[in-house]
Amino acid sequence: MMKVLVVVALLVTLISYSSSEGIDDLEADELLSLMANEQTRKECIPKHHECTSNKHGCCRGNFFKYKCQCTTVVTQDGEQTERCFCGTPSHHKAAELVVGFGKKIFG
C-alpha cells in the first residue's frame, strides 16, 4: 500500500510540474496577445473622429463597437463629398439605455 501512495505522489508531482510549464508558456502567449490588442486599440479611431478613409477602424464603446456613419456634404463650390465619423447608432444607444436602466433597478 505504501508503494502505491509513493507512486501516486510521484505522478501528481510530475503532472503538476508539467502543467506549470504549460501555464508559463500560456501566460507568455497571453501577454503577447494582450500587447497586440493594446496596439490595435491605440490605432483605432475614437468616437466623433473622422473615419472616411478607414470605415472599419472605429474603437469599441461601453457595450458595442462604434460604427462609421457617413453623410454627404456639399462644399461652397457645389461639389459633393462624403464625410464619415465614428459614432453610436441609435439602436445601440437604445440598448445601452435599457441596460443602464436595468442596472440601476436591479443593482
From Swiss-Prot:
Lineage of origin: Eukaryota, Metazoa, Ecdysozoa, Arthropoda, Chelicerata
GO MF annotations in UniProt: toxin activity
Family listed: Belongs to the neurotoxin 19 (CSTX) family. 04 (U1-Lctx) subfamily.
Keywords: Disulfide bond, Knottin, Secreted, Signal, Toxin
PROSITE patterns assigned to the protein according to its UniProt record, in alphabetical order: SPIDER_CSTX (PS60029)
Domain notes for this protein: The presence of a 'disulfide through disulfide knot' structurally defines this protein as a knottin.
Superkingdom, taxonomy of origin: Eukaryota
Propeptide: 21-41
Pfam families, sorted: Toxin_35
Expression tissues: Expressed by the venom gland.
Signal peptide feature range: 1-20
GO CC entries: extracellular region
Disulphide bonds in the chain: 44-59, 51-68, 58-86, 70-84
Intracellular or extracellular location(s): Secreted
Protein's name according to its UniProt entry: U1-lycotoxin-Ls1n
